[in-house]
Amino acid sequence: MTNIRKTHPLLKIVNHSLIDLPAPSNISAWWNFGSLLGLCLMIQILTGLFLAMHYTSDTATAFSSVTHICRDVNYGWLIRYLHANGASMFFICLYMHVGRGIYYGSYTYLETWNIGIILLFAVMATAFMGYVLPWGQMSFWGATVITNLLSAIPYIGTTLVEWIWGGFSVDKATLTRFFAFHFILPFIIAALVMIHLLFLHETGSNNPSGIPSDSDKIPFHPYYTIKDLLGFLVLILLLMLLVLFSPDLLGDPDNYTPANPLNTPPHIKPEWYFLFAYAILRSIPNKLGGVLALVMSILILAIIPFLHMSKQRSMMFRPISQVLFWILVADLLTLTWIGGQPVEHPFITIGQVASILYFSIILILMPLASLIENKILKW
C-alpha cells in the first residue's frame, strides 16, 4: 500500500513541498531565511490577531487602548512587544534574504524574484500602516509626512493624498482605514508567499556555487527540516532577548506621547528598517525627485537580473564583485545611520554621497566588475 502522504490530495502538496522535496546538498545557513520569514509572518499574524481583539481604531481611544493592552490584558505587554519587535526581526530576515539572493544570483529565477519584490513592497506597506496604529506622536507625524509624499505626483497628487486621508489631514478616517488594511494585508502576503514558493518549486533552489545541482539532491526531510528548526530556535531566542530585556530599544520615545496635530516632534523619522530609504529620499532637494529615488531604491531590485553580465551565476568565485557587494552592504548601513540623523552638515553630504554610491554600485560598478571578471577568466 502506498503511503497516505503520497496519495492524499492535501497531504500530497505538503509532501512535495516539505518532505520529499529534492533539495541541493550544499545550501548554507543563508538559505534558512525563507523559512524564518515564514515563521515571522506566523508570529506577526498570531500576535496581531490577539492585539486586534483589544485595540480600538478611533483617534480618541487608540493610544489608551494600546496602554490598556500593556497594563490590563493578561500578557498583553508580551503580545504587544512580540508584535513590535517581531516586525524588526521580519525586516532583518527580509534584508538578509534579499542580500543572499543578490550574492548568489538567485535573481535569475525571474518569477520567484519578482513575486519577492512585490512581497517586499507589501510587507513595507503593512509595517508602515502598523506603525500608525498606536497613535503616538511619531505615528501621526510619520503618517502625515509619508502620505504627503504622494502630493509630489503631478496633477493628481493633492487629490490622491486627500482621498487616502479621507479628509484634509490625517485623522479618524485615516486611522480606521489603516487598521483595516493593516489587518488584511498579512493574509494577502501569505497568499503571495504561496505563489512565491510555487514558482520556486518549478525550478528548485539555487545553491552557493550557482552550479545546477540536479545530479546531487537530498530529501528536504529530515535534513533541512531539522536545519530550519535550529534556525527557528535562534530567531526565537534573539526575539525573546529583545522583547524581555530591551523591548523599546528599536522604538521611538516620541511614540509614548499621544498624537498631537499642533505639536511637531523635532526629528520625524520612521522605524530603523526604513531609514536607508528615508535617507535616500532626504538626500535629493526636490520633492518629486526624492519620491522617485525612494521608490527606485527598492524597485532597482527588479532591474538587477538584466544587469547580470557575468558568465557565472554566484559571486562565490568572483572576488571583485564580492568586494563591491560588501561595500554596498556598508553603504546601506551608512544610509541607515544617516536616516536617523538631523538634516545638517556633515550628514547631508554623507547622505548624498552614500545615495549616489548605492545606485552607482548596482547600476554601473557591479556590471563592470562582471565584465572584468569575464576577461580575467580568459587569461
UniProtKB/Swiss-Prot annotation:
GO biological process terms held by the UniProt record: mitochondrial electron transport, ubiquinol to cytochrome c
Main localization category: mitochondrion
InterPro entries the record matches: Cyt_b/b6_C, Cyt_b/b6_C_sf, Cyt_b/b6_N, Cytb/b6-like_sf, Cytochrome_b, Cytochrome_b_C_euk/bac, Cytochrome_b_N_euk/bac, Di-haem_cyt_TM
Describe its membrane topology.
Multi-pass membrane protein
Q: Which residues bind heme b b566?
A: 97, 196
Q: Where in the cell is it found?
A: Mitochondrion inner membrane
Keywords, sorted A to Z: Electron transport, Heme, Iron, Membrane, Metal-binding, Mitochondrion, Mitochondrion inner membrane, Respiratory chain, Transmembrane, Transmembrane helix, Transport, Ubiquinone
Q: Coiled-coil ranges per the record? A: none
Q: Which GO terms describe its molecular function?
A: metal ion binding; ubiquinol-cytochrome-c reductase activity
Q: Which domain of life is it from?
A: Eukaryota
Cofactor binding notes? Binds 2 heme b groups non-covalently.
- Binding residues for a ubiquinone: 201
Cofactor requirements of the protein: heme b
Residue ranges crossing the lipid bilayer per the database entry: 33-53, 77-98, 113-133, 178-198, 226-246, 288-308, 320-340, 347-367
Which residues are listed for heme b b562 binding in this entry?
A: 83, 182
| Other observations noted | Heme 1 (or BL or b562) is low-potential and absorbs at about 562 nm, and heme 2 (or BH or b566) is high-potential and absorbs at about 566 nm.
- Return the similarity comment: Belongs to the cytochrome b family.
Task: Describe its function.
Answer: Component of the ubiquinol-cytochrome c reductase complex (complex III or cytochrome b-c1 complex) that is part of the mitochondrial respiratory chain. The b-c1 complex mediates electron transfer from ubiquinol to cytochrome c. Contributes to the generation of a proton gradient across the mitochondrial membrane that is then used for ATP synthesis.
Under PANTHER family, the record lists: CYTOCHROME B
Assembly and interactions? The cytochrome bc1 complex contains 11 subunits: 3 respiratory subunits (MT-CYB, CYC1 and UQCRFS1), 2 core proteins (UQCRC1 and UQCRC2) and 6 low-molecular weight proteins (UQCRH/QCR6, UQCRB/QCR7, UQCRQ/QCR8, UQCR10/QCR9, UQCR11/QCR10 and a cleavage product of UQCRFS1). This cytochrome bc1 complex then forms a dimer.
Q: What is this protein called?
A: Cytochrome b
- The record lists the organism as Lepus timidus (Mountain hare)
